[in-house]
From Swiss-Prot:
It comes from Shewanella baltica (strain OS185). InterPro entries: aa-tRNA-synth_I_CS (IPR001412), Anticodon_Met (IPR041872), Met-tRNA-synth_bsu_C (IPR004495), Met-tRNA_ligase_1 (IPR023458), Met-tRNA_synth (IPR014758), Methionyl/Leucyl_tRNA_Synth (IPR015413), MetRS_core (IPR033911), MetRS_Zn (IPR029038). This is Methionine--tRNA ligase. Its main location: cytoplasm. Binds 1 zinc ion per subunit. Belongs to the class-I aminoacyl-tRNA synthetase family. MetG type 1 subfamily. Transmembrane segments: none annotated.
């Protein structure tokens, strides 16, 4: 038992309930599960909760296209999500849904407290409205001809063909992506959360140690720009919770989504009467609350969420831990390459423990992207887990069973055991601080020592000589005891292997029992515990991921409008989908001033689904450009890169600020979009000719 038991509540971000889990998602759930399992292994009271994020226009429209009720659709997705997580050995204490009575009551409670405390404002805004569906249209649900390059079938906030950004009212011949009708402007009353009122509290909290330094530094940029009131309203029809005392008005999905952490814990408390909700969420709570999230949702979790909690009389989280994205083979996950791998596709081919270990071996406390290099993945798992760890037992256990009645000897020389036990605090600190990669390196260094000990002693030679039987018994017993310590250290990462090893030793693996004397203890006959990664299975997984893409492309188009097939897959013949434009003369071309630019800063734009704000150095001058590339790049990936911009494009006033040019990109759009990157020999300000 740990010296003093902690009370801990830990969460992962809620997956959206309109599609399957993929390996990019799995990074976060594996990272959180390892941390939760470690806390429990140390004897702490730790509750790991999550839920499906089950509200919003995309879910409503997808259910309509499928011809089923949204409730039925999210119930099926919830079942699939839970099965994927269970098969990856992610051990939630509770997995719920934001579309629950607990969450409705919590969202209403928080909203009413914010309203009563003066933090909710109302004002009239103008939005495009679909007269046929009688619904207001978010930007991404309006399509038309780009006002800049005249490409048809573009979204209401940016053009996938030329990268231009604009407002929906600027589209030529705008149409509702829901019904095809021509939208009209209509006024509506919306409620806003007064985020600026919490600026002082948020500045203090974000610098309190609750966030990684990278996150806190990034949030300073939002403070410099000035916090804005946050629109928390959506108009009917909408799949979500109706706002109290406001018929036809619904909570925006990002209001009730983080409240889903509280709703899920409420649900757990109902199942476990010994748990107290207020003990974890009350304003004066001394319990610990931690959120694990992706770096793309830092803004919501580090500004809106703590402010909402503070304004409604609840405690703030102790920490919000962000992680980077997953790349595969050094590039963004790609459906066309077969590297956009669903969790279920992986599970159809490979052991989930392989991925748990590989992610752990590459994870740190920083917000770095993690590359799943499939060749390195196979080599590392085969070397570390099969060649070092399991091999330690497989090469010694048989002698104990066959020659020594399955019983372990009392170890006379405990030098190695003491050296292994001396590392427990170092490894514990690495788990606690989320430095899993460092923990794995420490453990594998110990595995190398243990294997070297066995190789030098060569018990397979000893057993051939009558006078060396006891020495062989000592070596094999010592090796198996070291194996037990190693697997105990790895138990948070490899729970299924740990379970098999517990059956082999016929006793539980606990941190408190690391130094247990197993003299005379009987072990079970050794059984194979882990197979090598076979590259043909890895290749089959990639091939099946490509097949899944083809099935999707051939299937009826049931996806929500913002996820059209054209936007999510790469055409094998770009000129077929996007023919060459009409010929222009040289004088027209010469008017365009293309310059090399270095991206010196990139950041998210609040309430913009596709935009990133870029600060571009063009050689002695800095330009601000809003680029519709958020679906393909995170800000951190762009900073420092060279690109090409249209430098003499007239500045355009947008609701987010002034855009002073355009960066160039290629690709059909969505995640398949690539900015142009000149050779490093080019310098900012150089003209492209």
């Amino acid at each position: 038992m740990a010296t003093s038991q902690r009370k801990i509540l830990v969460t992962s971000a809620l997956p959206y309930a309109n599609g399957p889990i993929h390996l990019g998602h799995m990074l976060e759930y594996i990272q959180t599960d390892i941390w939760s399992r470690y806390q429990k292994l140390r004897g702490h009271e730790c509750h790991y909760i999550c839920a499906d994020d089950a509200h919003g226009t995309p879910i409503m429209l997808k259910a309509q296209q499928l011809g089923i009720a949204p409730e039925d659709m999210i119930a099926q997705v919830n079942k699939e999500h839970q099965q994927d997580f269970a098969d990856f050995n992610v051990a939630f204490d509770n997995y719920h849904s934001t579309h629950s009575e607990e969450n409705r009551l919590m969202a209403s409670d928080i909203y009413l407290k914010l309203r009563d405390n003066g933090y909710i404002k109302s004002k009239s805004i103008s939005q495009l409205f679909d007269p046929e569906k009688s619904m207001f249209l978010p930007d991404r649900f309006v399509k038309g001809t780009c006002p800049k390059c005249k490409s048809p079938d573009q979204y209401g906030d940016n053009c996938d063909s030329c990268g231009a950004t604009y407002s929906p009212t600027e589209l030529i011949n705008p149409k509702s992506a829901v019904s095809g009708a021509t939208p009209v402007m209509k006024d509506t009353e919306h409620f806003f959360f007064d985020l600026p009122a919490f600026e002082g509290m948020l500045k203090e909290w974000t610098r309190s140690g609750a966030l990684q330094v990278e996150m806190a530094n990034k949030l300073d940029e939002w403070f410099e720009q000035g916090l804005q009131q946050w629109d928390i309203t959506r108009d009917a029809p909408y799949f979500g919770f109706e706002i109290p005392d406001a018929p036809g008005k619904y909570f925006y999905v990002w209001l009730d989504a983080p409240i889903g952490y509280m709703g899920s814990f409420k649900n757990l408390c109902a199942k476990r009467p010994e748990l107290s909700f207020d003990e974890f969420w009350g304003k004066d709570s001394t319990a610990e609350v931690y959120h694990f999230i992706g770096k793309d949702i830092v803004y919501f979790h580090s500004l809106f969420w703590p402010a909402m909690l503070h304004g409604s009389g609840y405690r703030q989280p102790n920490s919000v831990y962000a992680h980077g994205y997953v790349t595969v083979n050094g590039a963004k996950m790609s459906k066309s390459k077969g590297t956009f791998i669903k969790a279920r596709t992986y599970l159809d081919h490979l052991d989930p423990e392989y991925l748990r270990y590989y992610y752990a071996a590459k994870l740190s406390s920083r917000i770095d992207d993690l590359d799943l290099n499939l060749e390195d993945f196979a080599q590392r798992v085969n070397s570390d887990l099969v060649g070092k760890l399991v091999n330690l037992a497989s090469r010694t256990a048989g002698f104990i069973t066959k020659r020594f009645n399955g019983k372990l000897a009392k170890i006379n020389d405990t030098t190695l055991t003491e050296a292994f036990l001396a590392k427990q605090d170092v490894i514990a600190d690495f788990y606690e601080s989320r430095e899993y990669g460092k923990a794995m390196r420490e453990i594998m260094a110990l595995a190398d020592i243990a294997n070297g000990f066995v190789a030098d002693a060569a018990p397979w030679q000893m057993v051939k000589h009558d006078d060396q039987q006891e020495a062989a018994h000592q070596v094999c017993s010592n090796a198996l005891n070291l194996f037990r310590i190693l697997v105990t250290y790895l138990k948070p990462v490899l729970p299924r292997l740990a379970q098999d090893v517990e059956a082999f030793f016929q006793l539980p693996l606990t941190w408190d029992a690391l130094s247990q004397d197993l003299a005379g203890h009987e072990i079970a006959p050794f059984k194979a515990m882990m197979q090598r990664v076979e590259l043909d299975k890895v290749n089959a997984m990639v091939a099946d991921s490509k097949d899944n893409l083809q099935v999707t492309a051939d299937a009826p188009k049931t996806a929500a409008p913002e996820k059209t097939a054209e936007a999510s897959s790469v055409s094998s013949e770009p000129l077929v989908d996007d023919p060459i434009s009409e010929t222009i003369n040289f004088d027209d071309f010469a008017k365009i001033d293309l310059r090399i630019a270095r991206i010196i800063k990139a950041e998210h734009v609040a309430d913009a689904d596709k935009l990133l704000k870029l600060q571009l150095d063009i050689g002695g001058e800095t330009r601000q450009v809003f680029a519709g590339i958020k679906s393909a790049y995170s800000p951190e990936d762009l900073e420092g890169k060279l690109t090409v911009m249209v430098a003499n494009l007239a500045p355009r006033k947008m609701r987010f600020g002034m855009s002073e040019g355009m960066v160039l990109a290629a690709g059909p759009g969505g995640s398949d979009l690539w900015i142009l990157e000149p050779h490093e020999g080019a310098q900012p300000g150089m003209r492209v000719k």
